[in-house]
């Protein structure tokens, strides 16, 4: 005969307790550890710093000491292979679970990467429970779902919303749509682009003329990239704007 604890483990073998769910809903870093505990580990302190910084700007807790107002612009610079893009996809999932009217425009250096980023966000939200030992988005946010029939990889909505997500490459068309969160994810493809003044000038022009016009009043922008050049997007912003930076 099995005791009560054995029965609980059979019902809930992965150990997803109410306390863990509440923690994952409240703290983005806890959400990441629930979704992928093998990658998000306490012996990688930069991951906690990244997650807590992203959550802080989303919640308006990064305060400009000079103005007393929350920062709205965040740039984070990390080397390759540190999980920047992956963490951003989980962050968008978490934000939409917390607030399902979050509207995101994400930009990568080309449409292929932009589509992959958007698909990872969408599929993470829409994942079905196949393995009882694997935690999925709906374990944490059971009422947030992608609207069926409106789930193209690069443009989709959540149930009850008109628009939640648009992904494009640098130079793409984003007219007619505004966002509460604009994300730029590694806009530089390689070192050849990083030191090509024409490419950098085109990116800057598209950023200032097109991307910024899509950020709604009170919206935030997040730029996460590996630094290549003092003339890249982050370099120009550091010269021209007051940003909150984490490196």
Residue spans for each PLM region:
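Short, flexible loop motifs at catalytic/binding sites
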Residues: 1-82, 86-247
């Amino acid at each position: 005969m099995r005791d009560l604890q054995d029965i609980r483990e059979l019902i809930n073998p992965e150990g997803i307790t109410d306390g863990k769910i509440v923690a994952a809903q409240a703290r983005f870093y806890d959400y990441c550890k629930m979704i992928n505990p093998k990658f998000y580990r306490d012996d990688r302190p930069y991951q906690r710093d990244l997650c807590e910084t992203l959550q802080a700007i989303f919640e308006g807790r990064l305060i400009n000491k000079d103005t007393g107002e929350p920062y709205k612009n965040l740039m984070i610079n990390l080397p390759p292979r540190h999980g920047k893009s992956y963490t951003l996809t989980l962050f968008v999932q978490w934000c939409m679970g917390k607030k399902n009217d979050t509207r995101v425009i994400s930009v990568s250096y080309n449409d292929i990467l932009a589509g992959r980023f958007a698909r990872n966000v969408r599929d993470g939200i829409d994942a079905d429970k196949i393995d009882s030992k694997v935690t999925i988005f709906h374990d944490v946010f059971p009422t947030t779902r992608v609207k069926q029939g409106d789930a193209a990889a690069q443009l989709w909505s959540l149930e009850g919303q008109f628009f939640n997500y648009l992904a494009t490459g640098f130079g793409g068309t984003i007219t007619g749509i505004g966002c509460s969160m604009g994300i730029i994810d590694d806009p530089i493809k390689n070192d050849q682009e990083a030191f090509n003044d024409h490419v950098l000038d085109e990116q800057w022009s598209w950023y200032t003329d097109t991307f910024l016009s899509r950020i709604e009043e009170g919206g935030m922008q997040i730029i996460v990239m590996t630094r290549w050049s003092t003339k890249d997007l982050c370099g120009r912003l550091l010269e021209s704007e007051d940003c909150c930076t984490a490196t």
